[in-house]
Amino acid sequence: MKRVVITGLGAVTPLGNGVKTNWRNLIQGKSGIVSLKGFPEYEQIPSKVAGVIPRGKEKEEWNVLDYVDQGKLREVATFTQLALTSAAEALKDARWIDIDEQEKLATGVCFGTGIGNLDDALNENGVLNKAGIRKVSPRVISKILINMPAGYISQRYGFTALNHTTTTACAAGCHAIGDAFNFIKLGHADVIIAGGSESCINPLTVAGFSKARSLSTKFNDNPKAASRPFDANRDGFVIGEGSAALVLEELEHAKNRNAHIYAEIVGYGLASDSYHITAPNPNGDAAYYAMKRSLKQAGLSASQLDYINAHATSTKLGDVAESIAITRLLCDVNRNPEAFPVSSSKGSIGHLLGAAGAIESVYTVLTVQKGVLPPTLNFEYSDIPQQFQCDYVPNVAKESRINVALSNSFGFGGTNASLCFKKFLQ
């Protein structure tokens, strides 16, 4: 069976534009979460914090005109613009841009998103109601379709092996990478750029999640403290925006062109809660089986596992269920959960929804490569029962030799996924 490696990375998040910027800020314990106070459209909404991408012309800020021509801005929704941004960095990093037609024929795209961009749909609906159909943009449908990130990336670079989109809520980015992994193993492509993108910080989304009691409201006066996975004072997630991309490549193909290899992707596990549309099963069954199946495909045991990048969104129910699942996985092989490192980068960037699994995969790959555990910000103490607690890497990054790591993503609708990354060895 073919082996698959990671040869390129790209990211734009609330921590900044670019993988190097993201990793440095993550490891230094910085936060990209800011206040929404002062914006009248959010005045009546209980949650007033969000993980917002820094925009501007400075080196580490995101300037859309570096990635999309001015004349095309009205045609391309923000979540697609972000996908083009992360894809551009990942492909450049992988040295996979100036390629011939045969290579394009063997290259595909897998991208995920949860909501995409509601702004354009809402705006055009307003235009229809106020000015009638003559004023409605003929481009509105092509702007809001969820598969546009994959479509635009494919078109820009001429990749024709496959063009695939996952729309599985907060697991979409993870599923896109996992599907790409399997596509390469099955011989459908030699190279696939995979990831996720999301840009849905708008009043309707924030109001909807607020009404569902999903978002943090306690820390409106202290935004950087609002996202606090596993901490006793957590009260909901912080919505965020961004995109991340990884270049997945068949091993022999990568070796033949002397590509730089970050890590190997070796497992992809899936499971369904079949319990509740928005809440996880408290016993963590689906999370457990997703991780177990990921390790099984990798041909590994939980005894060989060194780190888990948790989905942990800073919600009361979700963080406990995931901790229970992780503890069960470790106890299967008689390991001590309290000594096992588990961290969540959502304390730093918030919850990027459909892009979460993609950026967290980037962080996990770098954890494996560099041997540094990202911290869980704002962790003081946990209310999770003692027997289910892990080492949550509180507030400060630490060095550790990492050979095998999991990255978890779970979503509304009961969807669960886990990716297994391994230090690359010949």
UniProtKB/Swiss-Prot annotation:
Keywords assigned by UniProt, alphabetized: Acyltransferase, Fatty acid biosynthesis, Fatty acid metabolism, Lipid biosynthesis, Lipid metabolism, Mitochondrion, Transferase, Transit peptide
Signal peptide as annotated in the record: none
GO BP terms, alphabetized: fatty acid biosynthetic process
Transit peptide listed as a keyword: yes
GO molecular function ontology, one term from the record: 3-oxoacyl-[acyl-carrier-protein] synthase activity
Residues of the Ketosynthase family 3 (KS3) domain: 19-423
SMART domains linked: PKS_KS
EC number: 2.3.1.41
Enzyme class: transferase
Domain of life: Eukaryota
Gene3D superfamilies referenced in this protein's UniProt entry, alphabetically: 3.40.47.10
Gene Ontology CC terms, in alphabetical order: mitochondrion
CDD domains: KAS_I_II
Transit peptide: first to last position: 1-18
Active-site residues, Swiss-Prot/TrEMBL: C170 (for beta-ketoacyl synthase activity), H311 (for beta-ketoacyl synthase activity), H351 (for beta-ketoacyl synthase activity)
Function: May play a role in the biosynthesis of lipoic acid as well as longer chain fatty acids required for optimal mitochondrial function.
Family note: Belongs to the thiolase-like superfamily. Beta-ketoacyl-ACP synthases family.
Record's protein name: Putative 3-oxoacyl-[acyl-carrier-protein] synthase, mitochondrial
Organism: Schizosaccharomyces pombe (strain 972 / ATCC 24843) (Fission yeast)
Species lineage: Eukaryota, Fungi, Dikarya, Ascomycota, Taphrinomycotina
